[in-house]
Amino acid sequence: MSLLDTAAARPRGRPAPAAARRDRRTDAAVVAGLILVALLAFGPYTLDGGFYSDDWNFAADYQVASVDGFIAGVGNLLEISVSRPVGTFYAALRAELFGLDPTGHLIVSAALGLGVALLLYAVLRVLGMRPLHAGPIALLVLLFPLADSVRLWSSGSAANLAICLYLAGLLLALEALPRRGPLALAMHAGSVLLYAASLMSYEFTLVPVLLSVLLYWRRAPGRPALWRWGADVLAMAAVLGLATAQTTLEREPLSALPERAVEVSAGALSVISWSVFPLGDTADVSPARVIGGLIVIVVLGAALLRVRRGRGAELRPWLLLAAAGTLVAAAGYVVLIAAAGYNPAHRGIANRVNVFAALGIAMFVYALVMLAALQLGERLRRPVAPIAIALTALLVVGYAVRLQSDQSSWRDAADEQERVLDDLAGTPAPPAGGGLAAFRVPAFAAPGVPVFHQSWDMTGAARLLWDDDALQAYPVNNGRSVACAAGGVAVTGEEDDAELPYGRTRFVDVASGRSTRIGSRAACRAWLETREPRS
């Protein structure tokens, strides 16, 4: 097989024994290579990362209920995340196994990221792609830094769990398609269960499940593909109905969907531009983003022009792969249009929205590499393989550098959290079941990388610190403010509207260690008027 063998050609029956043995050895080498890269890329981080955002909330809520057993702990978490029951069970299981030590949680998160890469590799191989090409695509997915929060943040790893379940279901469905009889039905029933579990972990996989019929048809064209896809659709409709009835996610009104579609598309284009030219940021238009966009336009445009002139038959498979990657990426982004506030270009914990699209983006980028290598090789009269390897290596280095930079930011956030909690531990505890307003607490260590940025992470950490499962704590940052109302301390913010009772609330300036019990409206005003720390 040459370098140019791709997934565009349908698998032609069972390979010869020698070829099969060679493929097995190559598959084993690719798997070993991906495992090694995962250990090098994520192993050190698992030892010094921390809890972030929802991690604190889940840890505190599970701990208080789990004294009555694991099931009680699961039930308590379901009260705050009932629309994603499999993801919630996963969070409870991690809490039961690893407790308050982030290391075990982060090892599982990294393992799920590796699992996505390995399962994608397996799917591409089943669909006929040679290891030489499926391997680099899986490697790009493993390192893809614009969705790295799902590998660096324990709660975010539920998104990778969802993708693992989806890809496992897809593999099972593809293996079942050529078969007939009870075994085939049982295998597809298993795939439907995996799809359902995936959707009950995270919603990103809904559209991919509905589009899986395209792969079914490619694997085994005909009525069996349609019948089995029909079973998928019915199951997804039932699960989606349950999730929609229980969700607390803010949805955009229909009138806002066109504007949201433009916003999501612009963010996605910025992510794709960065993926091709991994320099700079994705948050705004910059020279780097323009260069990335021009690379896409020039390479695709030149390839399409050659094909149109009938001189680029070798380019067609890669154009098809680029189109398939675009479809996969779009399938990952469609669900964002109706969800308020999510943008693919955002950083930190918000980049989890790119997690499924990353599979398609990696396919698209690798197709672009091959299109560029083929055209450059012909123009320069040089072998294609070294050019393709060099271009892929440049991308891998760019991804790895950004990943290491992001990991440094997440480590900084963990260090800042430790400092904040040490400072809080040195102040008197709020009255039992009372409230805490913490001033001069850093919200983020880097864009989107939280220290304590919401009530749920501050509350979870404070409850664990003082062993008080009724305490409410608010960091006065990230647009949040306090006011001295008649009945108590009013806390307002984008996610908050609460009132903390006088006499059972403390104000703490984390930077100075100043701490005061707020017993009255006058005491509240005195604190704010004398010195209102800002963060």
Predicted regions and their residues:
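Transmembrane-helix signature of polytopic, membrane-embedded enzymes
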Residues: L120, L124-L146, I163-C164
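C-terminal luminal/periplasmic domains and tails of membrane-associated envelope-modifying transferases
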Residues: R21, A425-G434, V441-S535
